[in-house]
A protein has these predicted regions:
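Alpha-helical, hydrophobic structural elements that either
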Residues: 1-278
Length: 278
């Protein structure tokens, strides 16, 4: 007869201190067995597919297929010194720049939530992606990575005149800055008083349009102490739109050092693979 239940038996002396366990006492746990369809078990295959574009290498390492989802594992690395991959897509990512899984008939499988641990800044960057399950009779799939964001070297210094300025004043700048391979524009700045009485200098930035396969989408403020600073991002363009830095009272000029430009690189990195060999 088919077994429907098993019992796990363990002597208490193996689980408790000797003073608490009777010599012949046992701990028992009944475990019911549930019949499952073979399709509930994951089938997986190693892929080892590689594509390099614009100094960024993407390896499609493996795929697994279950009734609930299709999971893919990728590795992203930079082939240029001083450049590190930061994330797949952009920081504020519209769907069109996120990876997609497509079958031979052009059907796109929706992405599923997945804990993408280790998503930010390592070289190489290893990431899992999950999609809706594919039919068991599927034969060919295509995995497409449209955009990868990398951190490149680069520094720029912005000087903002503050003499005679008070909280609430707007300062017109229209200053061009060269950061790595890209040019950005500091449009204006505003002094704002916080509720706790401290001053913030908010600088509005225009990081510019996409240029070929590249787009400047972000940067960082270089400072010994950035406590209290913040950034604002434009959800439509996926680009940084403003930075804020704390200011001391009576400053005549603010010197803001910008570095670590974040660049979105447009591929596509495309991988075709067979499901039938799983």
């Amino acid at each position: 007869a088919e077994t429907r239940e098993v019992t796990l038996v363990a002597p208490l002396r193996a689980l408790l201190p000797p003073a608490l366990a009777e010599s012949d006492a046992e701990w028992r746990l009944s475990i019911p067995l549930v019949a499952v369809d073979a399709a509930d078990f994951a089938s997986a295959k190693e892929l080892h597919l590689t594509q390099s574009k614009y100094g960024v290498r993407v390896d499609l390492i493996a795929a697994s297929f279950t009734r609930e989802s299709t999971a893919l594992s990728i590795r992203v690395s930079s082939e240029r010194e001083g450049v590190s991959p930061v994330c797949v897509g952009k920081r504020l990512t519209p769907d069109e720049v996120m990876p997609r899984l497509v079958n031979a008939q052009g059907q796109v499988y929706g992405r599923k939530p997945l804990d993408e641990g280790g998503r930010w800044l390592s070289n190489p960057l290893e990431l899992p992606f999950a999609f809706e399950p594919v039919p068991r009779d599927a034969k060919q799939l295509q995995f497409v990575v449209p955009v990868i964001s990398v951190e490149e070297p680069g520094e720029a210094t912005l000087r903002v005149p503050l003499a005679g300025r008070r909280a609430g004043d707007e300062i017109q700048l229209d200053t061009k800055l060269h950061l790595g391979q890209h040019t950005l524009r500091a449009e204006s700045a505003t002094l704002e008083r916080r509720e706790d009485g401290r001053l913030d200098l908010i600088v509005n930035l225009d990081l510019g349009p996409r240029e070929g396969d590249r787009q400047l989408v972000g940067l960082e403020v270089a400072a010994a102490d950035t406590f209290g600073s913040w950034q604002s991002w434009d959800g439509r363009s996926g680009q940084l739109s403003a930075v804020s830095v704390p200011m001391a009272e009576g400053e005549q000029e603010a010197t803001i050092k910008l570095h670590k430009p974040l660049i979105a690189i447009y591929g596509d990195w495309t991988f075709d693979f067979s499901v039938s060999e799983q």
